[in-house]
Swiss-Prot record:
GO terms for cellular component: plasma membrane light-harvesting complex; plasma membrane-derived chromatophore membrane. It is a multi-pass membrane protein. This is Reaction center protein M chain. It comes from Allochromatium vinosum (strain ATCC 17899 / DSM 180 / NBRC 103801 / NCIMB 10441 / D). GO terms for biological process: photosynthetic electron transport in photosystem II. Belongs to the reaction center PufL/M/PsbA/D family. (7R,8Z)-bacteriochlorophyll b binds at residues 182, 202. One of its GO terms (molecular function) is electron transporter, transferring electrons within the cyclic electron transport pathway of photosynthesis activity. InterPro entries: Photo_II_D1/D2_sf (IPR036854), Photo_RC_L/M (IPR000484), Photo_RC_L/M_CS (IPR055265), Photo_RC_M (IPR005781). It is found in: Cellular chromatophore membrane. Its main location: membrane.
C-alpha cells in the first residue's frame, strides 16, 4: 500500500468528475466542463472546473480587468508606447497617485486621475469578490471563517490606499501602483515617519506573520508525518482521537513543551494570519495621524535608547587660524 513519504503528493486519487452541489433557482450556470490535470494533482485536486462566477463574480472580474487595463496602458504610455521598453522596464514602471496640492479632489487624468480611477475599479473588484466569497460560503452551508479573514486583508488594503489618505487629507499619501514603485514608497514612508520598525503595531504584525508561517509549517509537517496513521483525517480525529492525534500531541509536547489539538491548531493559524493584517492596518492608520516620528515615540516610551550626541571632529582647515604647515 502506498505511503505518504514525500513532501510532494505521490498518490493521486481520480474520482469521476463532480460538477458540484445543485445551484439554487435563479443562479447563473456553471461554466465549462470538468477536466483533469496531472500537474494540478501534484499539489492539489486534479479536477479543474466547472467554474461558477455568478453575478458578483462576473462583475468582480470585469472591474478587475478594467483596473489592470488602466494601470497597464498608463505604464505603456510612460515608455512612449514602446512594447520592448515596457517589457524591459516593467518592474520599474508605475502609476503614481495625485500630487499633494490636489488634496482629496479629483485631479486631471494625466496628473493622478488615472490612479484614482484604477483604485476605484480595483477596490470594487476586491469588495465584490468578498461578497462572492461570503455568499458562496452561505450557499454551501459553511461558516464564514474565510470571508472574515479576507475582510481583514481588505481592511489593510483600504488602510493604505483609502482610509489613511482621507485621514491625512491627501491622495498623495496613498501607495502607487507598480512593483518597484510601491517598494520604494514603503522605504520612503518608513524613513519619513522615523522608521516603522519602532511602530509597536508593526512589531506585532511581524510577530504574527512569523508566527503564522511557523504554525502552518509545523501543522503541515506534523500531519504529513502521521498521515500513515490516518492523520490526514483531521476532522474525524477532532472528536474521536486516534493514534495519529496522540502521536502528534506527544511529539509536540516532547519538542515544544505543549501541544495543540486537531481543532485548536487551525484556530491558532487563523488568528495569527488575521492579526497580521489587522495590526498592520492599525499601525498604518496611526502613522502620520497620531505619531509623526516613531523613533522619537520609541525613545519617549523607553522602547529605543536615546543615543548621546557624538562630538564632531573640527577640521583645522575650516577654522580661522588654521594650523602650522
Amino acid at each position: 500500500m502506498p505511503e505518504y513519504q514525500n513532501i510532494f503528493t505521490t498518490v493521486q486519487v481520480r474520482a469521476p468528475a463532480y460538477p458540484g452541489v445543485p445551484l439554487p433557482k435563479g443562479s447563473l450556470p456553471r461554466i465549462g466542463k470538468p477536466i483533469f490535470s496531472y500537474w494540478a494533482g501534484k499539489i492539489g485536486d486534479a479536477q479543474i472546473g466547472p467554474i461558477y462566477l455568478g453575478f458578483t463574480g462576473t462583475l468582480s472580474i470585469i472591474f478587475g480587468f478594467m483596473a489592470i487595463f488602466i494601470i497597464g496602458f498608463n505604464m505603456l504610455a510612460s515608455v512612449d508606447w514602446n512594447i520592448i521598453q515596457f517589457v524591459k522596464h516593467f518592474f520599474w514602471l508605475g502609476l503614481e497617485p495625485p500630487a499633494p496640492q490636489y488634496g482629496l479632489t479629483i485631479p486631471p487624468l494625466s496628473e493622478g486621475g488615472w490612479w484614482l480611477m484604477a483604485g476605484f475599479f480595483l477596490t470594487m473588484s476586491i469588495l465584490l469578490w468578498w461578497v462572492r466569497t461570503y455568499k458562496r460560503a452561505e450557499a454551501l452551508g459553511m461558516s464564514q471563517h474565510l470571508s472574515w479573514a479576507f475582510a481583514a486583508a481588505i481592511f489593510f488594503y483600504l488602510s493604505l490606499g483609502f482610509i489613511r489618505p482621507v485621514m491625512m487629507g491627501s491622495w498623495a499619501e496613498a501607495v502607487p501602483f507598480g512593483i518597484f514603485p510601491h517598494l520604494d514608497w514603503t522605504a520612503a514612508f518608513s524613513i519619513r515617519y522615523g522608521n516603522l520598525y519602532y511602530n509597536p503595531f508593526h512589531m506585532l504584525s511581524i510577530a504574527f506573520l512569523y508566527g503564522s508561517a511557523l504554525l502552518f509549517a509545523m501543522h503541515g509537517a506534523t500531519i504529513l508525518a502521521v498521515s500513515r496513521f490516518g492523520g490526514d483525517r483531521e476532522i474525524d480525529q477532532i472528536t474521536d482521537r486516534g493514534t495519529a492525534a496522540e502521536r502528534a500531541a506527544i511529539f509536540w509536547r516532547w519538542t515544544m513543551g505543549f501541544n495543540a489539538s486537531m481543532e485548536s491548531i487551525h484556530r491558532w493559524a487563523w488568528w495569527c494570519a488575521v492579526l497580521t493584517v489587522i495590526t498592520a492596518g492599525i499601525g498604518i492608520l496611526l502613522t502620520g495621524t497620531v505619531v509623526e516620528n516613531w523613533y522619537l515615540w520609541a525613545i519617549k516610551h523607553g522602547v529605543a535608547p536615546a543615543y548621546p550626541e557624538v562630538v564632531t571632529a573640527v577640521d583645522p582647515y575650516a577654522t580661522a587660524t588654521g594650523v602650522t604647515q
